[in-house]
Amino acid sequence: METSALLKQQIAKEIGLSQKHVESVIRLLEDGNTVPFIARYRKEQTGSMDEVQIQTISERWQYIQNLNQRKEEVIRLIAEQDKLTDNLKRKIEQSVKLQEVEDLYRPYKQKRKTKATVAKSKGLEPLADYILTLPQDDHLAATADQYISEEKEVFTREEAIEGAKHIIAEQISDEPTFRKWIRQETFKRGTIKSAAGKSADTDEKNVYEMYYEYEEPIAKVVPHRVLAMNRGEKEDILKVAIEPPADHIKAYLEKQIIKNRSTSVREILQETIEDSYKRLIQPAIEREIRKELSEKADEQAIHIFSENLRKLLLQPPMKGKTVLGVDPAFRTGCKLAVSDETGKVLKIDVIYPHAPVNKTKEAHEKVKKILEQYQVEMVAIGNGTASRETEQFIVNVLRDMPRKIYYVIVNEAGASVYSASELAREEFPDLKVEERSAVSIARRLQDPLAELVKIDPKSVGVGQYQHDVSQKRLNESLRFVVETVVNQVGVNVNTASAALLQYVAGLSKSVAGNVVKKREEIGKFSNRKELKDIPRLGAKTYEQCIGFLRVQEGTEPLDRTGIHPESYKETKALLKKLGLSTEHIGTAELKDKINQLALSETAKELGIGEITLKDICEQLTRPERDPRDKVPKPLLKTDVLQLEDLKEGMELQGTVRNVVDFGAFVDIGVKQDGLVHISKLSNQFVKHPLDVVSVGDIVTVWVDGVDVQKGRVSLSMVK
């Protein structure tokens, strides 16, 4: 079997999918297709894989190709030294990790100046070889004397033996089987320790207190503790080290090298093993293990952030509602923005209900007037500084209204970042930064996805140690999440911002800008075909993006569905077969006829796959289908709660704001989000909080404890 097929077989085995489908995915990716396009429109070829599975195949294929490239390079480099044996070549070819390849290459690597290379240059290698024969006679002194040479700067017997020991120490360190065993045993039996560092006195809030005298088995340490220790070490507050099972390792090395034989050089070899392990092996293995722990912890933190972001982006929109956005503040006043059902800003204002200005009565009347004048249906209050005081003020105004108006506390993380951005300046050139924040808060309630894509995903406030992980990997992962969600939901090409359009499959930032420019020139697009005229939107880009772009009330009714234009001919043939037309999309009559359809036979008749036909039928019956409709709506509120009102055992409803390794933070309407520790999430064992809760979930909780002094609330989801 050729190498490429073997690699594809390996990926299929790793992720538990059929080789045929894995090969199709790789072929589609190499042909320049995007992940969302493959997931949505090539289901027959992929066996209906989702975006995550396709992305996993893409990443594994990339890794395996890089691994193979390195294998070829290492084989070539060793062959150039005339040291490549069949056995070594086979070992390199069979390696499944980059680390294994590097271990095998280590003895042949061109080394910089080391104690061993210096000793070799002095001609001491034969003496090292002699010691490794484990001689029983006591001829070492006489043998070593033969290597004394002023010319080679070996002046004494001791220097000759010392040089030979350095050569042996490096040979031990370079032996791949030893390294592999030591790495595994250190992982299995070693511990990770932390202690107070030089700057421990700067840890005023005792954030790292639990790590001042801390030790835990490497095999059991959880990702968030690794990240905490890494951060503490970076800030010089902690010292972190790996404590290996040193005696166990040295005993193993003695057994491998001295082989329990009686020899006159036992003591010398024991000293050499000690030196090799302490000076060469242990520091390198410690670095490797710390790196591996950090990489795993990074991946976990990125996974949590990505999952939280996905849930946040999938929050359901409040369609067709006029919203008053409130950006709370004390001294500078609360900024107000009224946004109509299309997101158009109708009114901008400011009120000063709090200290030090205290114009509460005037503010009360102003808000009341705005609510009436613009027929506001919802109030969105940002959850930053002065949020709870503003919530109390708004509740008092709402009580004074003749009709019922609800309010929602909106997570405003990143709103200030957006407000000061170039994008916000372009969108609202006449508004001040904080006025833009109020608009952003209102629109976050109306359409969270459209608003959140304008912000750097790292600023949305749902991460865990996100500033400590690999920023490149984090950015890649978060971009993938945003792209996946945007394409799953679909985009109205006549209302979407360039910020939203740039995440549509195949569209770059500049092409998204060209789409908006063209729209502004012509007023609006009347069908999908018109997008072919956009500069730099070529045939391949059009194929990738067009199914995710919707044209509402255009000249072609199919353009408002998720059906790809490549299937329009078959779709119209299907409608004709049913005695209907595109005018019947979304009607009960069409739904009834499709329900009676023999899918398998119809697919054969139309010359398309059964899965594609199923998707077409779904779009014809529910063209407005939005995956966000399944998600619970935000918690609507009419009254306010104080920290002092909380009593142990009290039952409350709350919104999950963040999920981390050790639990979930829930907004229950008081100043501080309460923590549900992982042990209080369920009656059953919970491996990870994400198995039970997600960002945006509405949950029932019970108050477990309140610390008014520290402003901390402990919650439980177990009654």
Curated annotation (Swiss-Prot):
It holds the Pfam family S1. Residues 649-718 form the S1 motif domain. InterPro entries: HHH_9, NA-bd_OB-fold, Ribos_protein_bS1-like, RNaseH-like_sf, RuvA_2-like, S1_domain, S1_Tex, Tex-like_central_region. SMART domains: S1 (SM00316), YqgFc (SM00732). The keyword Amino-acid biosynthesis does not apply. One of its GO terms (biological process) is translation. Keywords: Coiled coil. Residues 64-100 form a coiled coil. GO terms for molecular function: mRNA binding; structural constituent of ribosome. It comes from the Bacteria. This is Uncharacterized protein YdcI. It comes from Bacillus subtilis (strain 168).
